[in-house]
Amino acid sequence: MTVLIHVLGSDIPHHNRTVLRFFNDALAATSEHAREFMVVGKDDGLSDSCPALSVQFFPGKKSLAEAVIAKAKANRQQRFFFHGQFNPTLWLALLSGGIKPSQFFWHIWGADLYELSSGLRYKLFYPLRRLAQKRVGCVFATRGDLSFFAKTHPKVRGELLYFPTRMDPSLNTMANDRQREGKMTILVGNSGDRSNDHIAALCAVHQQFGDTVKVVVPMGYPPNNEAYIEEVRQAGLELFSEENLQILSEKLEFDAYLALLRQCDLGYFIFARQQGIGTLCLLIQAGIPCVLNRENPFWQDMTEQHLPVLFTTDDLNEDIVREAQRQLASVDKNTIAFFSPNYLQGWQRALAIAAGEVA
C-alpha cells in the first residue's frame, strides 16, 4: 500500500509546528501513514524536534504545489492529506484533474473554508475554489464547519475532526481553585490577526460593560504588526481608561499565555467564522466562558458538549457571566470531544480513511 503524504501547503509557522509535533509525539509510532510530510516554510529545527517524521520543506506555495501535482500524476494510488488548504494552485489542480478526488483529503482549518476576503483576486477565485471543493474525496472538520460545508457540498463525505490543540489534561480541574470576584477581566481576540476585528470587538465590549472591566488583547502574533497594534491601541484608549486596557505586543511562551488566560473571566470573539479553537479550548479548560458571534458555527460543537455559550447579540452583564462560569465549572472537562487526548481517536480514524484502510 502507498503511504499517505501529509501536506502543509502554506507557511503558517505556529500551526504547522503544532501539527508536526503532534504527529511526531502521538501518531507516528503507531501508523506508517503519519510520517511523511511536505511543508512550505523553513526547517528551523523542526526536523530535529520531530525525528519520527520524514519532512520535505519547500520555499513557497508554488514549488510545493508543483511537487504534489507531479507525485499525484506519477502514481494515481498516492493519497494526500491537506492540513488547511490555502494553496490556490492545489485547488486548481483538483479542479482540472491534475489531482484526482480519490487522492485529495482535506482537514478544514476555518479560514480556508469561508469567503470573507473582499479583494478582487479573492472574489474571482472563490467560485473556482467552490467548484474544486465539490471534488474533494473527504473533508474533516468541526461539527459546525461540517454543517456549513454541507450546505453547498452535500454530496462530499464529511468526518468529525478537531485541530490538535496543545493541552495538558491534568489542568482540566485548574479552574476549581480560583475565586472570581471584583472587576472582570475580558480577553479580546485570539491573536493580532486582523480577522479578530479588534476595534469592533472593543467597541462591543465597551457597549456591554462600559469602562468597568479590564480588557486584555493578545497581539504578539503574527510578527511585524506594529502599525495595526498601534491602531488598535489608540481605538482602545478612546473607549477604556489606560489602567483597563492591556495590549500585549510581544509573543508569549505557552506557560505565560496559560497564566494570562487564568486571570480572565470571559473570552470575547467577534469573528464570524470558526477560528481560534486553541484559545477557546484553553479558556474552557480554565473554566472561562466565551462570547461568540452567532455566525461562528463552533457554537454547535460547544453545545454538543453541553458547554455554555454566550453570543455577541446577548445582553451581557456580570451576573450572566458568573452564571456561565458556574455552569462551566459543573462540566466534566475530561469528556469534552475537542480536548486532548479525546481528539486522538478522531485522528486515528481520519488517517485510516485517508489512507484507504477503512471505507
UniProtKB/Swiss-Prot annotation:
HAMAP family: WecF_RffT
UniProt keyword annotation of Lipid biosynthesis present: no
Gene Ontology molecular-function annotations: 4-acetamido-4,6-dideoxy-D-galactose transferase activity; fucosyltransferase activity
Alphabetical keyword list: Cell inner membrane, Cell membrane, Glycosyltransferase, Membrane, Transferase
Pathway linked to the protein: Bacterial outer membrane biogenesis; enterobacterial common antigen biosynthesis
Protein name: TDP-N-acetylfucosamine:lipid II N-acetylfucosaminyltransferase
Gene Ontology biological process: enterobacterial common antigen biosynthetic process; fucosylation
Reaction it catalyzes: beta-D-ManNAcA-(1->4)-alpha-D-GlcNAc-di-trans,octa-cis-undecaprenyl diphosphate + dTDP-4-acetamido-4,6-dideoxy-alpha-D-galactose = alpha-D-FucNAc4-(1->4)-beta-D-ManNAcA-(1->4)-D-GlcNAc-undecaprenyl diphosphate + dTDP + H(+)
Main location (coarse class): membrane
Species annotation: Escherichia coli O139:H28 (strain E24377A / ETEC)
Subcellular location: Cell inner membrane
